[in-house]
Amino acid sequence: MTQGICFILKPNMSIPPAFIEKETPFITRFGLWMAIWAHVLSGVATLFMVFPFANLKTRHFHIQQWSIKLLKIFGIQLRMMNPGILPSNSYLLASNHISWLDIHAINAFKPIRFVAKSEVEKWPIFGWMAKQLGTVFIKRDSSRHAHLVVGEMSAVLKSESVCIFPEGTSTIGEAVRPFKPNLFEAAVMADLPVYTLAIRYLSKATGQRSDVPAFVGDMGLLESMSKILKNRNLIAELTFFPPPAATPQQPSDRKWLALHSHEQIAKYLSSSNTL
């Protein structure tokens, strides 16, 4: 029987060499940047030459394969928890938000439509790609525009699942901010379940939560990409939770759905951080 080894670090105690994070060599990073731009160009070509003539199944195949390769370039391993609970029919997925990588980690598992902040649409190349993939863009802090987006989402949910990031911003992933309930109305209108997703990024070396992928503050996209390439060997962990069961005493409305999803993620992150 194989026994595990547990390291307990005390003050002034050094980290075992095997667990020290190693920075990616410059020459390797240069090659990875070349691989990224080649991969982006291949994605643009696919969007131009394949997507206009492809059915949904074919588009999903290309999206998944493109995302899998992107994660590989960045040295990110995908780990799923409870993926079998997701249904084959449409649903709304509510997730915490840490990084631009979140979208690609989810798509590498199972392609889905996203709702993203309107600023993403203005990103060079990547904004255009997101638009071609059917991303629904929302203006933050605009309740009027949110109402229009809810109508668009409910129409999309008739044939495809949709993922939202109800925090309205990204965080380092240590905790989850309160969820804004507006977009949950789309699931109520479409009479579809709301599944919850908790995202964490972990260091392969230590198994602990990593801030490296966090896309926060005034950080630019290229700056974030460079930071991740410099500190590769990460794990993107996706943990799925089932929808709540509505009762006559507690009907399913957007505020209740938002609160339930938030509590699931908050509880999970809190327990994970204490391990």
How should these model regions be labeled?
Residues 90-92, 159-165, 193, 237:
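Residue-level preference for the first positions of well-ordered beta-strands
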Residues 156-184:
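Catalytic-site beta-strand/loop segments enriched in glycine and acidic/polar residues
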Residues 42-54, 58, 72-73, 86-143:
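Catalytic core of membrane glycerolipid acyltransferases/transacylases, capturing the structured
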Residues 136-157:
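A membrane-cytosol interface segment of integral membrane proteins
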Residues 125-127, 174-251:
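A cross-family acyltransferase "interaction/gating" segment
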Residues 15-80, 128-132:
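A transmembrane-helix-recognition feature enriched in membrane-embedded lipid enzymes
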Residues 1-20, 73-83, 101-103, 115, ...:
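Soluble, non-transmembrane catalytic domains of enzymes that act on hydrophobic metabolites at membranes
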